Amino acid sequence: MSVALTTLLLFVATAVAELVGCYLPYLWLRKGGSVWLLLPAALSLAVFVWLLTLHPAASGRVYAAYGGVYIATALLWLWWVDRVTPTRWDLLGAGCCLLGMAIIMFSPRSG
């Protein structure tokens, strides 16, 4: 598997872990869910942090690039979980963010 594909898949897995870790407390606080949702939420956020450590690039670069993938994944979450169709502007914005991620992660670096 190519480095670019591996990086993208790792970012998507990281975003899903973060989204789940934030959505479960939302269900508890706003939708009357059980307080027990906080346990899997904490586990999911721990997985999120661990996944961020798996990238070989400098942490600041990883965090900056990850943000682009998070935005695109959050829009998929909006569509699949919240059942709200993203607008063309949402999709254009996500495309710009993914382009930024690609520039940050895959541009040539000097020695």
UniProtKB/Swiss-Prot annotation:
Domain of life where this protein originates: Bacteria
Principal cellular location given in the protein's record: membrane
SUPFAM superfamilies recorded: Multidrug resistance efflux transporter EmrE
InterPro entries documented for this protein: UPF0060
Cellular component aspect of the GO annotation: plasma membrane
Topology in the lipid bilayer: Multi-pass membrane protein
Pfam families membership: UPF0060
Subcellular location: Cell inner membrane
Coiled coil: none
Transmembrane parts of this sequence: 8-28, 34-54, 62-82, 91-111
Keywords: Cell inner membrane, Cell membrane, Membrane, Transmembrane, Transmembrane helix
PANTHER family attached to this UniProt entry: UPF0060 MEMBRANE PROTEIN YNFA
NCBIfam families xrefs: PRK02237.1
HAMAP family named among the record's database cross-references: UPF0060
Family: Belongs to the UPF0060 family.
Name of the protein: UPF0060 membrane protein XCC2880
Lineage: Bacteria, Pseudomonadati, Pseudomonadota, Gammaproteobacteria, Lysobacterales
